[in-house]
From Swiss-Prot:
The MYO6-binding domain is required for autophagy-mediated degradation of infecting bacteria such as Salmonella typhimurium, but not for bacteria targeting to autophagosomes. The LGALS8-binding domain is essential for the recruitment to cytosol-exposed infecting bacteria. It is a peripheral membrane protein. A motif (CLIR) lies at residues 133-136. The gene is CALCOCO2. This is Calcium-binding and coiled-coil domain-containing protein 2. The lineage of its organism: Eukaryota, Metazoa, Chordata, Craniata, Vertebrata.
């Protein structure tokens, strides 16, 4: 359903067909070709007066309320309603807003109150068939059709005359009906006001009646209560006379009891004094307990803080332990590598570990000193003493002055691996420390954990 910015006035009330003849649609085709604009011609009857918000809509056949329009166009108000040209009006629907299916539709004129004032015959939107374009008939059929057309034209004129007469009668009846409806609306309004007034008056009377009934019930109840109260007072008076005698006797008894109570009061006063002194002692004890509790709480807090500090230090020590463990594994791997290299060199020179152990000097003979960092000693010192200088070329480590045989294996690789064993690398930032600065290395790793 197509709508514009300003929607037309509609009604959700099911409408009757009593007002459909006030606007008559003329020259409505049985079908319209899709894709083209269509013009709707209509005639305003004598007693119908158009208004600014009246509109013409296209409705699908079978509609119930004026809200079911497919599209609509506002009507144009005539300048002079009394002229004949003002009664003949037209409105054009653009092809873009027209339905695209082949259902049956009809034009409906709706006033600004949402009341339908006229409806056209049904029509369709479909293309032309060949039967609609070309029709071939015989001469006799043509004559018969012409005769039939003459009869239809005559009948049409008679029907038009009858229609005009009926329209006039309908217009008169519509005017009368309009007056009656206005009178009926006036009477309904008056009746509604009277009913409202009567209802309000009735409500006031009912409220007053209920109030009177409630007051009557209250008075009756109070009267009954007063009678009961009088009986009760008389009974109380008799009882009070008897009680007075009892009270006189009771006063004497009470006097004796008072003397006895005075003696007990003195004893209780002494007991109360003792209890107050005992209470003061208890309060002092409670105060001391509170102070002890405060001291215990402070001590517990200190222990908690110490526990947290120890936990933190434990986690830091665990990190350092992991770092040192990895460094230890690295050193063990390097030591294994050096052992394998040592065995390979010994095998290359025709020596074994057992024979080499006898060649290693046990003291500082020959001006050389055993490096305490090597597990199996310096294998090259024995080789230097037992081998001729012509067989091996000896080179020294620039850090620890250890000997390396350059003719046996790659001196640069061996030297690099040897230097790695003499340094400590930080596993976090890869900073290198000499092996003799182990404490500085551990402090550096510990700083990363802070």
């Amino acid at each position: 359903m197509e709508e514009t910015v300003d929607d037309p006035p509609t009604s959700a009330v099911l409408l009757d067909h009593c007002h459909f003849s006030q606007v008559i649609f003329n020259s409505v085709e049985k079908f319209y070709i899709p894709g083209g604009d269509i013009t709707c011609y209509y005639t305003l009857t004598q007693h119908f007066i158009p208004r600014r918000k009246d509109w013409i809509g296209i409705f699908r056949v079978g509609w119930k309320t004026t809200r079911e329009y497919y599209t609509f166009m506002w009507v144009t108000l005539p300048v002079d309603l009394n002229s004949e040209s003002a009664k003949q009006q037209e409105v054009q629907f653009k092809a873009y807003y027209l339905p695209k299916d082949d259902e049956y539709y009809q034009f409906c004129y709706v006033d600004q109150d949402g009341v339908v004032r006229g409806a056209s015959i049904p029509f369709q939107f479909r293309p032309e068939n060949e039967e609609d374009i070309l029709v071939v008939t015989t001469q006799s059929e043509v004559e018969e059709i012409e005769q039939h057309n003459k009869e239809l034209c005559k009948e049409n004129r008679e029907l038009k005359d009858s229609c005009v007469s009926l329209q006039k009668q309908n217009s008169d009846m519509q005017a009368t009906l309009q007056k009656k409806q206005e009178e009926l609306e006036t009477l309904k309004s008056i009746n509604k006001k009277l009913e409202q007034t009567m209802k309000e008056q009735k409500d006031c009377w009912e409220i007053e009646l209920l109030q009177l009934k409630e007051q009557n019930q209250k008075m009756s109840s109070e009267n009954e209560k007063m009678g009961v109260r009088v009986d009760q007072l008389q009974a109380q008076l008799s009882n009070q006379g008897r009680e007075m005698e009892k009270l006189v006797q009771g006063v004497q008894d009470k006097t004796e009891q008072l003397e006895h109570l005075k003696e007990e009061n003195g004893q209780l006063f002494l007991s109360l004094t003792e209890q107050r002194e005992h209470q003061k002692k208890l309060e002092q004890t409670v105060e001391e307990m509170k102070q002890k509790e405060t001291t215990a709480a402070k001590k517990q807090q200190e222990l908690t803080d110490q526990n947290m500090d120890l936990s933190k230090r434990l986690s830091e020590n665990m990190i350092i332990h992991d770092v040192l463990q990895r460094e230890k594994e690295k050193m063990e791997k390097e030591n294994d590598y050096l052992k394998r290299e040592n065995n390979r060199l010994l095998s290359y020179m025709g020596l074994d570990c057992d024979s080499l152990s006898y060649q290693v000097p046990t003291s500082n003979q020959g001006g050389t000193r055993q490096d305490p960092g090597l597990v199996f000693g310096n294998p090259y010192s024995g080789i230097q003493e037992s081998s001729a200088p012509s067989l091996l070329s000896i080179k020294k480590c620039p850090t620890c002055k250890s000997d390396f045989a350059a003719d046996v294996f790659d001196h640069n690789l061996a030297l690099e691996q040897h230097l790695q064993t003499l340094s400590l690398n930080c596993p976090i930032c890869d900073k290198t420390f000499p092996a003799k600065e182990k404490q500085i290395f551990e402090d550096h790793v510990f700083c990363h954990t802070l």
